[in-house]
Amino acid sequence: MSGSCFPNRPSEEIDFHRPCRSSIRGITTVSTLALLLWLTVTGQMTRAQVAQNNQNPPENLKHLSLEQLGNVEVTTASKEPEQIWRTPAAIYVITQNDIRRSGATSIAEVLRLAPGLEVARTDSDHWAVGVRGFGGQFSKSLLVLVDGRSVYSPLFAGVYWQVQDTLLEDIERIEVIRGPGGTIWGANAVNGVIDIITKSTKDTHGMLVSLGGGNVDQGIGEVRMGGTNGKGLDYRVYGKGFIRGPEFHPDGSNFDLWKTGQLGFRTDWNLNTRDMLTLQGDLYQGLDGERVAISLYTPPSRQVFNGPHDVGGGNLLGRWQRQFSKDSDIQIQGYFDRTTRYSPQLDEIRNTFDIDLLYHVTVKGGQSVLVGIGGRWSPDAIVQKFATLDFQPHNETDSIYSGFLQDQINLVPDKVALTLGSKFEHNNYSGFEIQPNARLLWTPTSHQTFWAAVTRAVRTPSRLDQDLQLTLLLQPANPTIYLRVVGSKKFSSEQLLGTEFGYRTLIAKKLYVDLAVFQNAYDDLYGYGQGTIFVENSPPPPHVVFQLPLANALKGDTTGFEIAPNWKPVEWWELKGSYSFLHLYVHDKAGFTDNLNTVSDNGSSPHHQVVIQSLFSFPKKFEFDATYRYVSALPAQLVSAYGTADVRLGWHPVPSWELSIVGQNLLQPHHAEFGSDVDTIVGIKRSAYAKIVWRR
């Protein structure tokens, strides 16, 4: 067996309960290298510090101090700007500097930096993403936003990660909320919210050109141009394209070639001192490589498709903001989003229209009140290609109408605040839903924060839950037996009641620590109801069908904690990371027996995750960055524990040029991160690429 945690041959056995030897060797190797590097540079850095300070690095390379990091304003937790210190939620901010120095080439890769997130690459262009458990390829209990636009698909209540893209250089920050956010964001914000926020156009004047390529990320090209008309209107336009090769396939199928091209624009217009208008949009077209297995009623009974299929879409978003006074403001936002997917098993065409209004006012006594209303309509068209996979009806319009009210009460000014609120929604699947929460914040000093929260959130049913008809071959002959999974109109919303506690502190301005502890109780989770067996004559030939209806058959509990320290002992070195612990237990509700989903849910999330990121800023404008990740075993996905490391060397010879070399997954030739629905598991390969960026 090779040094990989993933066997080269399918017949090789994996031990899911012991750490991979290469992971242990990797920890030792990284630790040794870090120690040698520290001993080497310690004697040189003090002498070099004056020279470094005189080189005036460009603005976008300057680092926030840890104190400034705590004062960064975020909006995802309450829809209003508030400092991280005063946010009563488990929030983590991935900054533009974090993104640039991670060496990541996709948004999903960047999310690995956040504590509590489970990000596993299943092949070249698919990911399984989750927060505090229940991770999967479609992230069904997670809400993802791009500049306030939800990228949730009502077909399966999840996210197509391979089409969520923009210029990574244009992302200002990514705000990650671990824990329920249904009161503010509504349906699907059950386990967490990821809010991707791009830069204002006033921060992207000039031109940017970026080119890169390597053995897996074979070619990446990006261009962006921005400017102003001098009368309050700022703009940017961009284009990008890439081709990514396949990962490691034991059978040599190499089906996951990935290509995408994308164009986009944004304008921000200060109409006057009170009004701001934003208009932005994107268009994309690509090839999404995957393996699909389809069961048939006639020989050969099962057909496997390898290779890319067409995906495309676009969106247009408008936002108007008015500041009535220092104590009140209003925002109205609307967007249109179109998605087209032409895959071997079925086609999906979807148009989504969304509008919402948010009003904020600070009343006498310092209370901050938020009121909002919104609506979303999402008509689709599903084209059936095989009798064994269908959604009935083929055309459906998903609709959600919502309102929410939130009041932040300052019990002790600048010390203790209580936030009460609730979301009220009506959808065409489960009817009326209410999602309340209560949050308490205590800041005894300017460098300490305690918070606690109790929240109810729901995941409303999707088309898959109520309309799916999927038939899978179990036995090809004597007799021919099929398993049929069917949606149910009785499927109702999954429910969560979450309790959280948190603590943040800044110690001596050099060490920042963020701790969050949680306990979540789930009810009415996705599972299978009572099965039936019958003989079916049509379509011919006659065959046996074992039919399972989808039902709210399971309950579950998750408990755990995340700790994320950030240490900056000197100006030129930052060391940060996180440790995440999760215990997940899913079991049948009374009257149900669903061993398939209980085993899958209980064994598909890691108990332990570790991330360590070291950022060195050398003299002569060199940067050396290393990230180590450890993920414990996923028995249900046939994945052993693994550790891997990414390394980046960057150089800024002049402020307008940046050159970098990145190595990814360096500790083994390839390793598995998540299971496969079809045949063999894909191994994620060791890779490297070079990149050059020019800014003007």
Describe each PLM feature range.
Residues 75-92, 108, 112-153, 172:
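Extracytoplasmic beta-strand/coil segments of soluble accessory domains associated
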Residues 287, 293-298, 380-384, 394, ...:
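Surface-exposed extracellular loop regions of Gram-negative outer-membrane beta-barrel proteins
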Residues 410-417, 518-522, 540-634:
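Gram-negative outer-membrane beta-barrel transporters
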